[in-house]
C-alpha cells in the first residue's frame, strides 16, 4: 500500500510505537514512530561486464515515519499525519548502521503518450541530511497549527562495520533481529505545564523552584556574602 503522509493507515507500515511529547505550552501529545520494511532487491548487473554493480542493491533497509493525530496539528482529529521520516540501514546480523532523516516530496505527474498531463503521484520520502549539531534526525512539528517547533528522534548510534576501531556497537537502540517485534524502552524529554508549588535556597544562593508537575529547576539566585563581624553591620 503506498504511503500517504496526510492519512497514515496501519496497512501502510509493519510496526509502530508511541511516546508522549509536549508542545510549547506543556500540553501532552502522542507521537507515533511507524516502521515500514523496504523490499530486499539484488544488485543491478553491469551489461558490459556481467558483474554486479556495488551499492545498487537494497538489503536490510527500513523507512520510518513520525506521526501525530490531526488534532495535535490543528487539522482533522482522528487522522494520523506524518510530519517527516527517514531511513534505517542494518547489518545482516541486525546491528544499526545508520538512522538518517527524510522529508516527503510530491512526485510530478509528467505527460502521457497522448500528450495529456498525468496526475501527480503520492508524496515520496526522500533523504535529507541529519542536523550536524544534534546528530539525530529532526522534524518541524506545527503543534495546534502554530509556529513549528523541532522534535529530534534518536533511534540509536549506528556503527561502521568497515572500521574495527569504531567503538559504537549498533546495539544501543533499534535493532533488526528474527522474532516478534518488541519495544524494550522509550523516553522523551520535555515536561507538562505546572504551577510553582515550593521553593528552596541552595547553599550557593541558587533559588530552586518545585512545580506541581514534579519538575524542578533553578529560577534565580540570591547574592550571599559573609562578614567577619556581623555585629558591626
Q: Where do the model's predicted regions map?
A:
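S/T-rich, low-complexity, solvent-exposed segments of bacterial secretion/appendage proteins
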Residues: 1-233
Amino acid at each position: 500500500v503506498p504511503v500517504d503522509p496526510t492519512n497514515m493507515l496501519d496497512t501502510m507500515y509493519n510496526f509502530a510505537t508511541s511516546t508522549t511529547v509536549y508542545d510549547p505550552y506543556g500540553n501532552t501529545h502522542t507521537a507515533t514512530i511507524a516502521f515500514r520494511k523496504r523490499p530486499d532487491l539484488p544488485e543491478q548487473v553491469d551489461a558490459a561486464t556481467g558483474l554486479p554493480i556495488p551499492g545498487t542493491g537494497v538489503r536490510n533497509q527500513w523507512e520510518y515515519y513520525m506521526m501525530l493525530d490531526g488534532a495535535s496539528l490543528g487539522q482533522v482529529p482522528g487522522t494520523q499525519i506524518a510530519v517527516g521520516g527517514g531511513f534505517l540501514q542494518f547489518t545482516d546480523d541486525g546491528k544499526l548502521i545508520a538512522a538518517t532523516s527524510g522529508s516527503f516530496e510530491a512526485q510530478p505527474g509528467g505527460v502521457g503518450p497522448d500528450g495529456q498531463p498525468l496526475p501527480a503521484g503520492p508524496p515520496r520520502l526522500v533523504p535529507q541530511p541529519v542536523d550536524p549539531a544534534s546528530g539525530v534526525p529532526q522534524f518541524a512539528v506545527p503543534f495546534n497549527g502554530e509556529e513549528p517547533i523541532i522534535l529530534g528522534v534518536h533511534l540509536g548510534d549506528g556503527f561502521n562495520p568497515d572500521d574495527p576501531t569504531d567503538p559504537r556497537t549498533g546495539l544501543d537502540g533499534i535493532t533488526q533481529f528474527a522474532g516478534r517485534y518488541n519495544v524494550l524502552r522509550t523516553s522523551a524529554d520535555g515536561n507538562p505545564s505546572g504551577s510553582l508549588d515550593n521553593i528552596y535556597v541552595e547553599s550557593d544562593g541558587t533559588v530552586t523552584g518545585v512545580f506541581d508537575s514534579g519538575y524542578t529547576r533553578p529560577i534565580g539566585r540570591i547574592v550571599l556574602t559573609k562578614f567577619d563581624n556581623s555585629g558591626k553591620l
